Structure formats: structure tokens, C-alpha cells
Amino acid sequence: LHDQKLNSVKCENNQMIFTFDIKIFPQDYVGDCYKQYECYKHCDMIVEMKEESFNDYNFVSATDKNGKFEGISLSQAEFVNAINNAYTAEFIDCFANNSELKIELSVNYYNAEKQYRKYRKFSLCSVALYAEKVIWNWY
């Protein structure tokens, strides 16, 4: 999913569903990897979260010339609203540590509507979810 465009995020029935638009090119892959995924146009990353889990949703700015950066922590509802209204959001990475799943997204609010302009200074979204299971649905 590296560099794939995030289309939407929704939360329902204790699941966080990240839907990505898939566009891959043969020159970016080796061996059978391209052939395995070339026919897919979308992917849902479905995270089944633990009951009463403590999840983190953060936006972080790039480091300025003085080595300083800013960050904010959002509620789940604020995160879903903000990420679904980003100018662009792309998958960077995800990794699991025990039951914690960390997801990193590149975000851009360049052409954001007025209420989302406050996010313009942020370039990274970091999400930590306490997950029971992660399902990848390619279609």
C-alpha cells in the first residue's frame, strides 16, 4: 500500500475501515509482486478494535529549520472528520507490536475548506489502534 491514496475512513461496529485507491506500476515492483496485485483497484484495511481500547490519533508537522515541530492529538470523531476532508492522504507504513497497530499517513490540507485550514501545517498522521485483528480486502 505504500504511496497509495486514502479514499476514506469510517468507524462502525468497533471497526476502523481505511479504504485506499490502488494504482501500481510494474517498474515499482519485482518478481511476482506486481502480477499479484495488478488487477486490484481498491483495498480496505479493516481494523477490528478491542473493546474499550485506548487509541491515539495524532497529526504532526514537519521539523522546521530550528528543529522544532508541532503536533495535536484528536478524538476518533475529529480524526475521521479531518482525514476524510484532507486534500490528499497517502499510506506510508504500518506495523504491529503485540496488539497495537500503528499506521502512518502522509497528509496535505493545501486546498482545505475553511474549517480544515487549521491542519495545513501538519504533514504526518500517526494512528495507534489496539486491534484484535486486521483484515485486508483487495478488490
Residue spans for each PLM region:
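Surface-exposed, interaction-prone regions used to assemble/regulate multi-protein complexes
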Residues: 1-139
